[in-house]
Structure formats: C-alpha cells, structure tokens
C-alpha cells in the first residue's frame, strides 16, 4: 500500500515536471536578428554564374578637329581678306605675307596699307582667329647676308618682336626658301634664339618647309632642304607647315599632278617620324597649272572654273592623284592644253590623310580666288 502511494506521488511529480518543461520552451524568447541581416538574406537571389566573359569597354575617343589656316599673299591682300570673311567659320589661323628680308639681311615690311592690316587683325580677333604673319624670302642673297653675321640676325629677331608687339600678332611664320647649306647650323641657332624671345611674350613660332619624303637627293631646292632638318626644326618650332605641293613644278615642260595623293602620304609618313604630330600642318594648294605646249600658266580656282564652264567640261577629276584634270584643245590654235587643279574632292582626300596621320591641321596656299571650294 505504501509502495503504491509512493508510485502515485512520483507519477504526479513526473507529470508536473514535463508540463513545466514544455511551458519553458514555449515561452522562451527567440534570438533577435538585425533588420539588415534579415532583409539581405530574404532578398538574396542566387543566380548561376555566367559562363560568358564580359565585353571590354571601349571608350569612344573623339579625334580633335583639324585646324585650318591659310596664307594671304601681299600682292592679293584685299582678295585674301574677302576670302577670310567668306570662310570665317572654318579658319583658325591666317598668315598674311607681310614681311621679307632685305639684301642686307634686315627685316622689311611689304607695301601693304596699315588700314588693311588693321582690318584683317580686327576681323580675325573678333572671330577667334589667330594672326601669324609670314616672313618670306626667295633668294640666297638676303638669307646669306642675314646668317653670315650674328649681329645682323639678332637685329632681325628684335625687329620681328617689335612688329609682333606693335600689331599684337599671335606669333611669326618663317618661309625661307633659299638658304645656303653652309648656314644650316646658323639657321637652327637663329630659330632657337627667336623661339626664346617669342616664348617670353607667349607668342608662336611657325616654320614653313619644303616637302621631304626620303633621303634621296632632291632635284630642286636640294640645298635648302639640307638646311631644313625636320628633326631639329620640330624640336624648336611650335608649328611646322609642310608645302606638300609643286610635285610637278611650274617650271616643268611636261604636265603632271601638282600634289598626287600617294606622294602626300609619303611626305606625311616621313614627316611624322621626325616631328611631333601635333605640330604638323599639311600645306594644301588651291591653285591650278595649265600647260600650253611646253609653257605653263598658274591659275586661281576662279580661272579654272571659268575654263571648265566655257568648254562645258564635266567630271574633271582624276581619282588616282586626287586632283582635277582636264585635257582640251586650246583657244589659241590647234595645240592641246592640259590642266591640273584643286577640287573639293581633292581637299577632302587630303583631310582624310591628315586625320589618318593625326597631324594638327592643314594650311591653304592661298586664300583669295578659291570661290566655294573650301565649303
């Protein structure tokens, strides 16, 4: 009896213990989790890893637009100003040929009215166009006189600086087309000293040179080309303008292209290997040559257009050389005339090459009489 009573009490105690144990776990508080952890886990979507490689990101780098400049000859100054007005939106720089070198080596201003110079200067400044006048020399006498004596060329430099300050020009362009080879070192020294003085005034040095395309002996201008060391000039000058025309010269008795496109490419390839690309300007001709027998006549594009219109000549363009070409009977008799000249298509091809070689710009010879060929 006593044993049964004890078992009964033990059973009651065991039952109460199980109930208490169950209630404990029922009301036990859950472990808190941070809201951020909970949200990130609930929103996480597991995606299969892509087996395809990501495409490389290629930046679309826009090439800087070609700068366009043009020379204005002293003998057609007013016509040149008219051309600047007409092409005001495309020009970045103009180079009026205002100066030359006297036989004694001194700087000489060409006969151009001061009012015309001021008119051009004002027009250019109002339209954010740089004015960098040219000092041109086409004979050995003047350059020899200047380079044989350092005091003379130093005086020449001082005169250039004075003129730049007088008219507030943006710099100076040098076009010395006849220099004796013995003055090569002196010429380079002259450039360096001129550059030093221009830099003090924050002005630009531009040097115009003949086209070079190999290391061969050149038939014409060979002595000057020896002096025009592209590598040395390129280190000193801010801009180097290459006269990439007159492949077939005015003096040639046989007709031929003025600047065939394949030759221009050789010139650019040769030049860009020696001069920083951002300094190079490709010279582009805007004129034509007409051969009557063995005689040659230089023509503006206006004259070329008149001939083509008068004779009803159409599609006068040679794709092989990227120039205009026409062959016709001359008015003067039974002789055959041949004419090579610039065209819109030709200019476009030259711009394509300039962009291909990533040079700075192009320079037109010359502004005036080109009609709408630049548009």
Give the residues covered by each predicted segment:
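N-terminal Sec-pathway targeting helices
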Residues: 1-16, 25-28
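Active-site-proximal beta-strand/loop segments in catalytic clefts of secreted hydrolases
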Residues: 71-75, 96-99, 134-138, 175-178, ...
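Glycan-binding loop/region signatures in secreted carbohydrate-active enzymes
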Residues: 284-350
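Acidic/aromatic/glycine-rich contiguous surface patches that form carbohydrate-binding/processing clefts
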Residues: 350-375
């Amino acid at each position: 009896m006593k044993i049964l009573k004890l078992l009964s009490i033990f059973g009651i105690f065991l039952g109460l213990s199980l109930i208490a144990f169950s209630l404990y776990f029922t009301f036990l508080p859950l472990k808190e989790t941070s809201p951020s952890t909970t949200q990130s886990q609930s929103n996480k979507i597991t995606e299969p890893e892509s087996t395809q490689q990501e495409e490389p990101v290629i930046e679309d780098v826009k090439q800087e637009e070609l700068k366009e400049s043009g020379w204005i000859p002293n003998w057609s100054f007013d016509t040149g100003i008219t051309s600047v007005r007409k092409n005001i939106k495309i020009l970045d720089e103009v180079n009026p040929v205002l100066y030359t070198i006297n036989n004694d080596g001194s700087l000489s201003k060409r006969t151009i009215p001061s009012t015309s110079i001021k008119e051009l200067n004002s027009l250019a400044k109002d339209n954010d166009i740089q004015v960098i006048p040219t000092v041109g020399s086409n004979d050995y006498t003047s350059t020899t006189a200047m380079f044989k004596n350092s005091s003379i060329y130093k005086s020449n430099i001082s005169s250039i600086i004075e003129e730049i300050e007088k008219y507030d020009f943006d710099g100076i362009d040098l076009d010395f087309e006849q220099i004796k080879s013995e003055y090569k070192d002196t010429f380079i020294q002259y450039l360096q000293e001129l550059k030093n003085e221009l830099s003090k005034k924050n002005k630009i040095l531009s040097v115009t040179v003949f086209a070079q395309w190999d290391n061969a002996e050149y038939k014409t201008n060979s002595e000057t080309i020896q002096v025009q060391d592209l590598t040395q000039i390129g280190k000193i000058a801010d801009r180097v303008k290459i006269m990439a025309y007159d492949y077939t010269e005015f003096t040639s008795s046989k007709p031929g292209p003025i600047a065939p496109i394949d030759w221009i490419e050789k010139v650019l390839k040769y030049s860009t290997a020696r001069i920083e690309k951002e300094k190079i300007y490709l010279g582009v001709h805007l004129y034509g040559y007409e051969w009557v027998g063995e005689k040659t006549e230089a023509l503006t594009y206006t004259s070329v257009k008149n001939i083509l219109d008068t004779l009803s000549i159409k599609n006068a363009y040679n794709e092989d050389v990227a120039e205009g070409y026409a062959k016709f009977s001359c008015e003067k008799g039974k002789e055959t005339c041949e004419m090579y000249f610039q065209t819109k298509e030709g200019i476009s091809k030259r711009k394509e090459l300039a962009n291909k070689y990533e040079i700075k710009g192009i320079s037109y010879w010359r502004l005036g009489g080109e009609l709408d060929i630049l548009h």
